[in-house]
């Protein structure tokens, strides 16, 4: 039987809608906690030697979600001491969500719709799920995903906060959790 990692060893998984800052926060948080950082989307691109948008276009969303599911579950169940950033839609898959909640500390980076919408021009070209969508459709997707993101270990509001401030807050909360819950 596989040993369950202690609270200090558990991977930390960052979830939230695309473009909320999971990668930026994750990279800095990993450095602060002396852990490796894994961006699942970047790992998929490395493994498949193509952009996510090309995988969507050539293989379809269903094939991409299967790749994403297998890779994410492997990271959650077979590694420790990592900070892992998930793509915005990954956590919508039941199997991924279950693996994350059972084996990791799941942190939801929450950003309001109004502030997310301000980032839209920067995001749209690299997000296949947003291609050819109207703003109203994007808002529907944003709203639809919120209840699933609420299933987490804890949540941090990111509105009006710089990445460094979010990282410092998370480091403090995580270390406090380690003290309270021990090994």
From Swiss-Prot:
Enzyme Commission number: 2.7.1.71
Location, primary (coarse class): cytoplasm
Primary enzyme class: transferase
Pathway assigned to this chain's UniProt record: Metabolic intermediate biosynthesis; chorismate biosynthesis; chorismate from D-erythrose 4-phosphate and phosphoenolpyruvate: step 5/7
Cofactor section: Mg(2+)
Sequence positions that bind substrate: 41, 65, 88, 145
Compartments (UniProt record): Cytoplasm
Species for this entry: Halalkalibacterium halodurans (strain ATCC BAA-125 / DSM 18197 / FERM 7344 / JCM 9153 / C-125) (Bacillus halodurans)
Entry annotated with the keyword Kinase: yes
Sequence similarity: Belongs to the shikimate kinase family.
Binding site for ATP: 19-24, 127, 161
GO CC terms, sorted: cytosol
This protein's name: Shikimate kinase
One of the GO biological process terms: aromatic amino acid family biosynthetic process
Database matches in InterPro entries: P-loop_NTPase (IPR027417), Shikimate/glucono_kinase (IPR031322), Shikimate_kinase/TSH1 (IPR000623)
Keyword vocabulary terms for this entry: Amino-acid biosynthesis, Aromatic amino acid biosynthesis, ATP-binding, Cytoplasm, Kinase, Magnesium, Metal-binding, Nucleotide-binding, Transferase
């Amino acid at each position: 039987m596989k040993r369950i990692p202690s609270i200090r060893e558990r991977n930390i998984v960052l979830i939230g809608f695309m473009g909320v800052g999971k990668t930026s926060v994750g990279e800095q948080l990993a450095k602060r906690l002396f852990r490796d950082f894994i961006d699942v989307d970047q790992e998929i691109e490395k493994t498949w030697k193509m952009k996510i948008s090309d995988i969507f276009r050539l293989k379809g969303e269903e094939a991409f979600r299967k790749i994403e599911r297998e890779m994410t579950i492997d990271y959650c169940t077979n590694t420790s001491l990592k900070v892992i950033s998930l793509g915005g839609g990954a956590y919508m898959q039941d199997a991924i969500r279950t693996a994350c909640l059972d084996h990791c500390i799941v942190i939801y980076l929450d950003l309001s719709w109004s502030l997310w919408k301000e980032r839209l021009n920067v995001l749209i070209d690299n997000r296949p799920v947003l291609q050819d969508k109207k703003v109203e459709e994007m808002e529907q997707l944003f709203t639809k995903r919120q209840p699933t993101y609420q299933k987490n270990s804890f949540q941090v509001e990111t509105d009006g906060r710089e990445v460094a401030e979010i990282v410092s807050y998370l480091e403090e909360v995580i270390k406090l959790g380690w003290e309270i819950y021990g090994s």
